[in-house]
A protein has these predicted regions:
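C-terminal regulatory/oligomerization modules of transcriptional regulators
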Residues: 89-134
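Alpha-helical linker/hinge and terminal dimerization helices associated
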Residues: 16, 54, 83-95
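Canonical helix-turn-helix DNA-binding module
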Residues: 29-62, 66
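Basic, helix-initiating cap at the start of DNA-binding domains
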Residues: 7-9, 48, 72
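N-terminal helix-turn-helix DNA-binding core of bacterial DNA-binding proteins
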Residues: 2-39
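Extended, folded domain segments that form the structural surfaces/walls around functional sites
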Residues: 27-32, 80-90, 99-101
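Basic, amphipathic "hinge/linker" alpha-helix immediately C-terminal to the N-terminal HTH DNA-binding motif
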Residues: 11, 63-86
Length: 134
């Protein structure tokens, strides 16, 4: 049920790419369109409006005449950064692209791990079998 909801919000071709384009901070429409190679302006407009309705993006006017907006992620939108990193790493492995997500400081390919904030440690390999989805 939770996965179905998540996919209903972010499960089309462009939505996660729009969110990923906003992970580094607010963007104006033109900047975002340029960064998302191949997206039609009407598709970007539709996605941004829907993401705003879904509470993942916040639009802030930076010009009144004409009205122009800058787009930024809400807290809920920023929460998707981990999912985007996981999907990006998976895509890199499937396509043989050695340039999956990299650590900004040293350039090493990032790995994703399950982590328990209560125990303050990563889940061990044997523990993963006991994972429950709540």
């Amino acid at each position: 049920m939770n996965l179905a909801y998540a996919l209903s919000v972010i499960g089309d071709r462009w939505t996660l790419q729009v969110i990923a384009g906003l992970l580094d901070g607010p963007q104006r429409f033109g900047e975002l369109a340029e960064a998302l190679d191949g997206i039609a302006p009407n598709v970007l407009t539709t996605r941004l409006r829907q993401l705003e309705r879904d509470g993942l993006v916040v639009a802030t006017p930076y010009s009144q005449r004409p009205v122009r907006l800058a787009y930024a992620l809400s807290d809920a939108g920023r929460e998707l950064s981990g999912a985007i990193a996981l999907l990006s790493a998976w895509g890199a492995r499937q396509t043989g692209d050695a340039e999956g997500p990299l650590h900004g400081e040293c350039g090493t390919a990032l790995e994703t791990r399950l982590y328990c904030p209560t125990c303050e440690r990563p889940a061990e390999e044997g523990v993963r079998e006991a994972l429950r989805w709540i």
